[in-house]
């Protein structure tokens, strides 16, 4: 007899009266005076549990069934029947139940069947996927990731696995985690007293990557359309609801593409993945709309149907300066727009997703293409109502002399980027790309308030538990 997932039963894929086995964990148990017990059994395959109806004639009813509590794992064999009660179309009439695992002490079980705060759940991150909330987040996260891969594949992109250990600082910001096997109690020193990294594992300084972009450009300049999708790391000491030290990024890179091409790709990708999650995770999205953010579903539908607005950074600054609203962070040309500025543009002024383009060069990375005005670079941010920036990208600087100029301006040693510069020496082409912070995308989709609740085991300052 085959083991079937709960979702197949609840969605009617198993014929009525068929004999099946489901395996999962007990969410709740209730007993009637008529000698019948009802178990809510979930296996994570969908939001809702399956109800198992158990008669007291089962041989282990007294010794096992009446001892079951939330969190126990069970294997239930029985017949699929149409449910007479409300709440579900189908249930299972149990013919045999095997208890696979007991909860040691139900009184101290951290995941007792009640609503827990997200702050508490972070303290028990190894058990929190058993809750409705984090289970729904996990399924939505999976669907969004699969939709990104599917979209890229359909658009002819190749997935490239870029290294997590690097010697390059993509952003030039210096907020990187160092990778070393040196003995911290007995560091080797050079004659002038500095740490001698020649004796380290890689023979030089090495770090965890902040982005796969530079390596991705290498493959885009050979395969034309590639993307990376994996973890990135920032040693930024920010203990906020918007920051993680370890997070995932999706980073497409396209040869022979302009900034406008990248903006068009970003719009198409976001609409594709939002439609996928609405279609494939309707039950979980309904939960988020009911319990977390009543606009969760409507927000995605409006995003999908909206035409993206486009505005130059200079014009955006004018709009903000003349809007009559007082901002916590004053607006002037040359600043990096803050979240309040971004949200005003998307929510109040344009009332739609916005692509802000052509930022001042001094607030952007060295690899962004210099515009003809000598003051701005071909950079873009996609701003979404409700969250602000959701994607950042640019046309890359394909001219070697301009790239060297930017490296010098930012105090970066061009010899450290010798291989990146080679791409400009051997058949250089215009190319563009962007980065999508995956956890920020999940926050936007679900309405969750803290980014630490949309990644399985969050890493943040003073926190690397589990």
Curated annotation (Swiss-Prot):
Its main location: cytoplasm. One of its GO terms (biological process) is asparaginyl-tRNA aminoacylation. Belongs to the class-II aminoacyl-tRNA synthetase family. Coiled coil: none annotated. HAMAP family: Asn_tRNA_synth. This is Asparagine--tRNA ligase. Disulfide bonds: none annotated. InterPro entries: Aa-tRNA-synt_II, aa-tRNA-synth_II, aa-tRNA-synth_II/BPL/LPL, Asn-tRNA-ligase, Asp/Asn-tRNA-synth_IIb, NA-bd_OB-fold, NA-bd_OB_tRNA. It is found in: Cytoplasm. PANTHER family: ASPARAGINE--TRNA LIGASE, MITOCHONDRIAL-RELATED, ASPARTYL/LYSYL-TRNA SYNTHETASE. Homodimer.
């Amino acid at each position: 007899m085959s083991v079937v997932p709960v979702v197949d039963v609840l969605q009617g894929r198993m014929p009525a009266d068929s004999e099946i086995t489901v395996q999962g964990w007990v969410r709740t148990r209730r007993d009637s005076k008529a000698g019948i017990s009802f178990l809510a059994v979930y296996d994570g395959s969908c939001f809702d549990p399956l109800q198992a109806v158990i008669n007291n004639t089962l041989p282990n009813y007294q010794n096992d069934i009446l001892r079951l509590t939330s969190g126990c794992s069970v294997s239930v064999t029985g017949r699929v029947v149409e449910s007479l009660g409300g709440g579900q179309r189908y249930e299972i009439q149990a013919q045999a139940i095997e208890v696979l695992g007991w909860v040691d002490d139900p009184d101290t079980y951290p995941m007792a069947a009640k609503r827990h705060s997200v702050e508490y759940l972070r303290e028990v991150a190894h058990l929190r996927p058993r809750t409705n909330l984090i289970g729904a987040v996990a399924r939505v996260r999976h669907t969004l990731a699969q939709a990104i891969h599917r979209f890229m594949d359909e658009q002819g992109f190749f997935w490239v696995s870029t290294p997590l250990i690097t010697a390059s600082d993509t952003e030039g910001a210096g907020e990187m985690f160092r990778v070393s096997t040196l003995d911290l109690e007995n560091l080797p020193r050079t004659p002038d007293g500095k740490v001698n990294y020649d004796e380290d594992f890689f023979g030089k300084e090495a770090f965890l990557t902040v982005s796969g972009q530079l390596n991705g450009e290498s493959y885009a300049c050979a395969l034309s359309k590639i993307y990376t999708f994996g973890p990135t790391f920032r040693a930024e000491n920010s203990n906020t609801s918007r920051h993680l030290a370890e997070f995932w990024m999706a980073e497409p890179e396209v040869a022979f593409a302009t900034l406008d091409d990248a903006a068009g790709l970003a719009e198409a990708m976001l609409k594709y993945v939002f439609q996928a999650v609405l279609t494939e995770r309707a039950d979980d999205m309904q939960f988020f709309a009911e319990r977390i953010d009543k606009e969760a579903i409507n927000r995605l539908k409006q995003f999908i149907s909206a035409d993206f607005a486009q505005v130059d950074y200079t014009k955006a600054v004018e709009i903000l300066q003349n809007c009559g609203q007082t901002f916590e962070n004053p607006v002037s040309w040359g600043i990096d727009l803050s979240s309040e500025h971004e949200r005003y543009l998307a929510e109040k002024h344009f009332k739609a997703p916005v692509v802000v383009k052509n930022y001042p060069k001094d607030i952007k990375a060295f690899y962004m293409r210099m515009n003809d005005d000598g003051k701005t670079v071909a950079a873009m941010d996609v701003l979404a109502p409700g969250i602000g920036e959701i994607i950042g990208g640019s046309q890359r600087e394909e001219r070697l002399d301009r790239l060297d100029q930017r490296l010098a301006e930012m105090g970066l040693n061009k010899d450290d980027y010798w291989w990146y510069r080679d791409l400009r020496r051997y058949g250089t082409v215009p190319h563009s790309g962007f980065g999508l912070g995956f956890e920020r995308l999940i926050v936007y989709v679900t309405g969750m308030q803290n980014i630490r609740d949309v990644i399985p085991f969050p890493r943040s300052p003073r926190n690397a538990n589990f």
